[in-house]
UniProtKB/Swiss-Prot annotation:
Disulfide bridge map: none
Sequence positions bearing Phosphoserine: S139
Parts of the chain on the Cytoplasmic side: 65-535
Name this polypeptide is given: Inositol 1,4,5-trisphosphate receptor-interacting protein-like 2
Extent of the signal sequence: 1-32
Keyword Calcium among record annotations: no
A Pfam family of this chain: Mab-21_C
One annotated Gene Ontology cellular component of this protein: membrane
Transmembrane segments: 44-64
Locations listed in the record: Membrane
Family of the protein in this entry: Belongs to the ITPRIP family.
Species this chain originates from: Mus musculus
Extracellular side: 33-43
Length: 535
């Protein structure tokens, strides 16, 4: 993405004047030195033209500065305030919140579709070769040594904001699901933990997956199945309540090792196009593939990119099991798991396919010029502005409460409550739509309403996203903000409202052209657009 620069006229014109003066002086110095050899010493007034040129340049610069000062005085509201009447006239000339939002969106938030398209295509080619190499290295079933193992399914699924048209700032990070294939002798029996009464809210969105024998037409005995699957159970499962459960930790460990071997296979073939490296991950941060452009690659829009490769186990109907969500606090109360549950056996659920269908369904019914995706992008930018000035730990906690997924769910919830985007979501009402979302988030943070998962909610969106696996249809509703304690939610709501009230001032300081930041925002505009009632 191109870097944008703004021209400072206060520096530009003196610099041009000085440069022109230096060039004229150099020209006359060289000319006078040549003429001095041929002329007699009585030509002592040869420096007079140089003095005239310098005086003319100086007068021209003074005239330009005087013209600029006169224009500033003649413009309404540009002079210094001389009483209440002049201050009111000046406040009318200040750019409103809508203009500031549009300027900030164009200069700081909006992505170039051209650059984003090239970046996504480049990522698809690199990840596609890596996944195909991983698939060729092993297949499900019996492998050397007689053990059963996982394998790459051979495809990948692009998820996240870059593929849902609401990514902001730079197209340098992407999320990709890498589906894994189970051996044919292994089947899963997933179970939701949402109905566990003794479980803390942070883990009620998790699932556990016990192993079970797949339906067999030959009627093989259960004992024989246990003996056949023993290598797989010992390598990828942990014991929970007397049954073997698939472990996200052990699957991630195998996934990282298999990625390293696959990357070694394709690294040589990629040398002419890019340099690739793999950073190991954890349950909170999956392995990251770093793609750096080569000097010999002259392709368009080559950037340094980071691709998070997320191992995923397919449940059915486009729903995948992934690593569980991180705990609400860095300390993470994993010791509070009751009933013999183990943290290694917990899984999260990824419904990116259903959410993409839901966004497509809304786009089909939205009027031309609907700005709900732009509002989502500006909501993310508002969150980032609110994190300024916080220490790293507080900024991380703020980002977890108002994560991108929470903000996207809030936008979807508001739209689904209205049925579909109405004409009120036109770009002409951008600031009003953003204010509506801020109020909705404030109510959710203050527990005046719940913010349910858009697929795992009480009503859900099953009619719009298509069929769901039975385990999801029967799962308890998931409130995305329930894992956070009331005090943290109240602080987040207060900071969100404070950021919204100061938004015009923040936009003048941190974004947009310089002409929007010449004067401080008047008090009437700083208050404009903020929610009336506070927590």
């Amino acid at each position: 993405m191109s870097v944008r620069y703004t021209l400072n006229l206060r520096v530009f014109w003196p610099l041009v004047t000085g440069l022109c003066t230096a060039l004229v002086c150099l020209y006359h110095a060289l000319r006078s030195s040549e003429d001095a050899r041929a002329e007699s010493p009585d030509g002592a007034d040869s420096g007079f033209p140089l003095l005239k040129v310098a005086i003319l340049l100086l007068l021209g610069y003074i005239l330009l500065r005087c013209r600029h000062a006169i224009r500033q005085r003649l413009l309404p509201g540009s002079s210094r305030p001389r009483g209440h009447a002049n201050f009111s006239a000046r406040s009318l000339q200040e750019p409103g919140l809508s203009i500031l939002l549009e300027s900030y969106y164009e200069h700081e938030v909006r992505l170039s579709p051209h650059v984003l398209g090239h970046s996504k295509a480049h990522v698809s080619r690199i990840v596609g070769e890596l996944v195909q190499a991983g698939r060729a290295r092993g297949s499900p079933g019996l492998i050397t040594g007689g053990a059963l193992a996982l394998a790459f399914r051979g495809d990948f699924i692009q998820v996240g904001s870059a593929y849902e048209q609401h990514k902001i700032r730079r197209p340098d990070s992407f999320d990709v699901l890498v589906p894994l294939r189970l051996p044919p002798q292994v089947a899963l029996e997933p179970r939701s933990l949402g109905t566990e009464p003794s479980l803390t809210p942070a883990f009620r969105s998790c699932f556990v997956c016990a192993l079970k024998a797949p339906p067999s037409p030959s009627g093989a005995s259960t004992g024989q199945w246990h003996r056949d699957c023993k290598p797989f159970a010992e390598g990828f499962c942990v014991d929970v309540q007397g049954r073997r459960h698939l472990s996200a930790t052990l699957v991630l460990r195998w996934f990282q090792a298999h990625l390293q071997r696959s990357l070694a296979t394709v690294r040589y073939s990629l040398e002419g196009r890019c340099r690739v490296s793999l950073t190991p991950g954890s349950l909170e941060q999956p392995p990251t593939l770093h793609i750096l452009p080569c000097r010999t690659d002259y392709g368009c829009c080559r950037l340094s990119m980071a691709v998070r490769l997320i191992p995923a186990v397919h449940l059915g109907d486009g729903v995948f099991l992934v690593a569980p969500p991180p705990p609400p606090s860095p300390s993470g109360a994993l010791s509070e798991l009751p009933g013999g549950l183990r943290a290694e056996a917990l899984w999260g659920v990824n419904t990116a396919r259903q959410e993409q269908k839901l966004l497509g369904w809304l786009q089909e019914r939205a009027p031309p010029g609907a700005c709900y995706l732009k509002c989502l992008q500006l909501l993310k930018a508002l969150r980032d502005l609110g994190a300024r000035g916080l220490d790293p730990m507080a900024a991380t906690h703020w980002g977890r409460i108002l994560s991108s997924y929470v903000l996207k769910t809030a936008v979807l919830e508001v739209l689904l409550n209205e049925g579909s985007p109405t004409p009120s979501w036109d770009e002409a009402h951008l600031s009003e739509c953003l204010e509506k979302l801020v109020k909705f988030l404030r109510d959710c943070l203050l527990r005046r309403r719940d913010l349910f998962h858009c697929v795992l909610g009480p009503t859900g969106a099953a009619a719009e996203v298509g069929p769901l696996p039975k385990v999801l249809r029967e799962a308890a509703p998931v409130d995305l903000l329930a894992p956070f304690d009331p005090h943290s939610r109240e602080l987040a709501a207060a900071r969100l409202l404070s950021t919204w009230r100061r938004l015009p001032q923040l936009l003048r300081v941190y974004g947009g052209p310089r002409y929007l930041a010449r004067c401080p925002a008047p008090r009437s505009q700083r208050i404009q657009g903020s929610p009336e009632d506070e927590p």
